[in-house]
C-alpha cells in the first residue's frame, strides 16, 4: 500500500519551520503513543537540527501502558526526554513546562548572567496530522484557540499561542512525509486514523489490524467477536466476524465492506482495550 499525501500547506510549513527555528528554545515533538515511531516524520530530525526536544507521547490512554514505558526507556537511552500525555483530559500536561525549564536551565542562566531580561520559553510544537496538536494547545492555553477535529490536516497556518506567562507556543500544520516507503508505517497510520480513509484501501487496514490482534492480543480478539479460535485464513476470519455481527447480504453472503467498517471502528474506539501497534525493537 503506497500512500502519497503531501498537501501544499505542508511543504510551506516545512520551509516556515526552518525559518522560525532561530526564535525557538525547545521543540515538542508530538507523536501518537500507539505508534510512536510510525507517527514521527523522518524529515523532522533533519529540520530541527540540534534543538532541545521533548517527545510527547499523546493519546497515552489509548496505548498499552506497558509498551509506552518501553518506548520512554528507549527514548531515554537516546538522550531524549519523553512524557506520556493525554491532551483530551490533561494527563501529564503539568509536566511539560516543568521539564522544559529543567532542560533549558543552563541556557536561561547564561542569558541572565549576560543581563538579558527574563522572558517566556518559546516552544515549537510539531507532529503529523491528527496527532492532537490543536487539542494540546487549547488545553495548555486554557482557551479554544486552535481548530480541532478528527480529520487529518485541520491546522493550515502557523500561530503563536501564549501559555500563561511562562511559555509561548508556535503551532504548525501537521507535517506528513511525501510517501511511506515502509508499507507497515502506512498501515499503522491508517489503522489509528492519522490519514484520510478516502485515500486508503480500508480492507487492507482491517486485515492488518486483525493479524496484529491475533499475534499480540489474541484473547481480546476472541472475546470481542465471541470466537472459540481464530481461523488462519483471513477470508474465514472475516466471514466469522461478519456472521457474528450480522453483516449479511441477500443469499447469505458476507458484506465485507460493512465487516471492514466494524473492525476498524472497534480498533479506533478501543473496543479491544488500549493497543500499541509497534515496539521499540520493531
UniProtKB/Swiss-Prot annotation:
One of its GO terms (cellular component) is cytoplasm. GO terms for molecular function: GTP binding; GTPase activity; RNA binding. GO terms for biological process: ribosome biogenesis; translation. SUPFAM superfamilies: P-loop containing nucleoside triphosphate hydrolases. GTP binds at residues 58-61, 86-87, 130-135, 174. The keyword Zinc-finger does not apply. It holds the Pfam family MMR_HSR1. Keywords: Cytoplasm, GTP-binding, Hydrolase, Nucleotide-binding, Ribosome biogenesis, RNA-binding. Residues 14-178 form the CP-type G domain. InterPro entries: G_CP_dom (IPR030378), GTP-bd (IPR006073), GTP-bd_ortho_bundle_sf (IPR023179), GTP-bd_ribosome_bgen (IPR019991), GTPase_MTG1 (IPR016478), P-loop_NTPase (IPR027417). The keyword NAD does not apply. It comes from the Bacteria. It is found in: Cytoplasm. Belongs to the TRAFAC class YlqF/YawG GTPase family. MTG1 subfamily. Essential protein that is required for a late step of 50S ribosomal subunit assembly. Has GTPase activity that is stimulated by interaction with the immature 50S ribosome subunit. Binds to the 23S rRNA. Required for the association of ribosomal proteins rplP and rpmA with the large subunit. Interacts with ctc. Interacts with the immature 50S ribosome subunit. 2 molecules of rbgA bind to one 50S subunit. This is Ribosome biogenesis GTPase A. The gene is rbgA.
